[in-house]
Amino acid sequence: MARSRVPAAASPAKLGPLLSRRFFARSVHEVAPELIGATLLVAGVGGLIVEVEAYHHTDPAAHSYGGETPRNRVMFGPPGFAYVYRSYGIHWCVNFVCEAEGSASAVLIRALAPTHGLGVMRKHRGLDDERSLCSGPGKLTQALGITIAHNGAPLDIEPFAIHRRTVEPDIGTGPRIGISKAIELPWRYGLRRSRLVSKPFK
């Protein structure tokens, strides 16, 4: 099958079927690349997922590596729920819990190509530059209005809606960003040639 490149920024198009929680009940390394090109909406605002990172419970960089705590409890729950935490005490990050309950594995959503509700995103972010609206995990949560109130929310019930991708993207892999452990693991997945990813893929 010929690959079609998902654009770095796109206009609203026909959405694919909604993903159910069962989609996430698989290896985090299967789920993560399949999220590239999917559309994430929160209360109708969002865009195409262009960059993610996988975190497994055996991974020293994962929040769950040291065991269950009040902060990471959602990671230890069933798949298909949002795990939201504050990074460096500054901004929120949103993850999708994967694998069987107790596995404590998740996919961090790093970047989106805005497609829906750009006016709302611009208001939330206080800027007009479309490229800067969702080009980072903290930026996209601010743009979509994601906060700790969304922690533990099911991903297949409003305000969340995740639509399966409708084209096969050209996916790149590489080391994850901003971590100090397991830095050699190529567990970052993203849309190759996108200008919105944290670091270009080779």
From Swiss-Prot:
SUPFAM superfamilies: FMT C-terminal domain-like. It is an enzyme of class 3 (hydrolase). One of its GO terms (molecular function) is alkylbase DNA N-glycosylase activity. It comes from the Bacteria. Disulfide bonds: none annotated. Its EC number is 3.2.2.-. CDD domains: AAG. One of its GO terms (biological process) is base-excision repair. Keywords: DNA damage, DNA repair, Hydrolase. PANTHER family: DNA-3-METHYLADENINE GLYCOSYLASE (PTHR10429:SF0). Belongs to the DNA glycosylase MPG family. This is Putative 3-methyladenine DNA glycosylase. It comes from Rhodopseudomonas palustris (strain BisB5). The lineage of its organism: Bacteria, Pseudomonadati, Pseudomonadota, Alphaproteobacteria, Hyphomicrobiales.
